[in-house]
């Protein structure tokens, strides 16, 4: 479903992709998975430079609920400096990331099977 959402975003006439990074196919060493887009959006509003229509820039991160939960935990660990056993936590986060990715694939397979019957 992530790639369907990415394709939909790319099809929008007022959205231009500036940069994209696929951390689902190119998983980070710590297990992080997500799809990042830097986009330019043309909107019928004046931008900070006074252009109308205006051009606005945004980052869009597309990921599953499981990926988002993992990213939130990893973010907390990264910025909390008084953690005991950080090596163990990093190892466990990587293991969880791999398990969540396998679960995401299984859930997508189930969804595809359900949709194939309709």
Question: Each predicted region: which residue ranges?
Answer:
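Intrinsically disordered, low-complexity acidic/polar and Pro/Ser/Thr-rich regulatory regions
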Residues: 106-118
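Long beta-strand-rich cores associated with HINT superfamily self-processing modules
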Residues: 1-109
């Amino acid at each position: 479903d992530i790639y369907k959402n990415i394709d939909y975003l790319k099809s929008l006439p007022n959205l231009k992709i500036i940069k994209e990074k696929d951390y689902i196919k190119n998983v980070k060493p710590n297990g992080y998975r997500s799809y990042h887009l830097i986009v330019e959006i043309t909107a019928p509003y004046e931008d900070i430079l006074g252009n109308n229509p205006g051009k606005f820039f945004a980052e869009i991160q597309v990921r599953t609920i499981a990926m988002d939960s993992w990213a939130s935990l990893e973010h907390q660990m990264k910025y909390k400096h008084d953690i005991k056993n950080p090596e163990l936590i990093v190892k466990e986060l990587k293991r969880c990331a791999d398990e969540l990715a396998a679960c995401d694939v299984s859930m997508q397979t189930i969804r595809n099977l359900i949709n194939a019957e309709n």
